[in-house]
Amino acid sequence: EGYLQASEGKICQWQKILHDDVEKLRVGLVWAGAPHKEIREAEIADRRRSMSLTTLAPLAACSANVSFYSLQLGEPASQLATPPAGLNIIDHTARLHSFDDTAALISCLDLVIAVDTSTAHLAAALGKTVWLLSRYDQCWRWLSHRTDTPWYASLKIYQQTRPLDWSTPVNAIQQDLLHHSAQQID
């Protein structure tokens, strides 16, 4: 259960937009944070928490049962112009003008896969299932060596096992998503 709710009116608008996409699991994606280049420490941390869209290429194996939706804003969203082969991502971010718009779209999804960003926190606060891709030296708020968090019951942490190497958490998410999507579709 979440402790935030999006505007009912905005949720209804998103339900109309997404109404044809009912056969597959709806999964939101965020692969990069905001670098905050004006704050050196934040920019350095962002390099460790963000990835390129191509890093999520293994998720293409899930496309038969999953519709992917971009929740990525900012400059990293330009990577949608050349997504990894087979990773078809629906992009409605031009319709996101506020955090409430984002919350309403997330409310219509089944799952959010994200790096440690405000979108991940928003989705978890809404009670949405969140699979968080966390850097090797993860932020203190996620505690150490845990896959769960006391802050959000619906959030699962997939942490790097080696600095700057996303292969282990992304492959774990791919396997979990294959399993989860097959269960949801059956």
Please give the residue ranges for each predicted region.
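Catalytic machinery of carbohydrate-active enzymes
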Residues: E1-D186
